[in-house]
Amino acid sequence: YQRAHIPGAISCPGGDLVYRIDTLVPDPVTPIVINCAGRSRSIYGAQSLINAGISNCVYSLEKGTVGWWRAGHALAQGAGPRAHEAGLPATGKRRDAARRLALACGAHAIDRDILKHWRGEAENISLHLLDVRLPEEYEAGHTFGAVSAPGGQLVECSDDWIGLRGGRVVLLDDDGVRAPMAASWLRQLGYENVAFMADGEELEPDETGLPAGEVHEPGESGPEDAYYPDCATLEEDLLASEHYVLEQIKLPEQVRRDGLVSFSPHE
């Protein structure tokens, strides 16, 4: 977002959208447009709002900031308004909607006793304990053994955090909205054993900071780090990429025709 964003856009991580939308857009008839750099995260964010029963018209911006730039529109850089600075969200109805959605998708609502039991079985059955809140919330205090996995990024890059599709995945938050929303998406992605805390049950934080060995660079990147090529250069690069892809698609057929590689059964 700081490198490049559409003027007037509010920075809101995808995993926080449903949690914070009523504070950001209190009017139920105001259209909502979600964008990212390209397409996948904006689709995820927009569909999350729709799945949660938001009454507003929700749109995903096709091709995101890259498409905006290629169309000749200006992009803003640097810090801008951030969703979590807009005030404390009202979570009641969103919590109920998120819970219903997660359960409908096949996720499980568990309590502290079940989690304690699963911790005891972790040597034999993999347990991924993931805190889906913002990184700064995680650093301020989190459950022992939990790993920071912000909800939107977790859905986008789930294999960065979850090593086994059949392992147990328990998602944690402190609001009862973000964890079940992320759980609904992990179930739709095919993860088999996904759970969240029942009734938005909060776990008391007993650790602060980052896990040992995890590198955290303080500070924020600014406009000096941004690089957006001019449209002519971007077009040239894209054409070169398209040509490369087309050549790679044709390569296997050419190999079959030319017989470049062959092995006898004994080799």
Predicted regions and their residues:
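Rhodanese-like catalytic fold shared by cysteine-dependent sulfurtransferases
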Residues: 1-128, 132-267
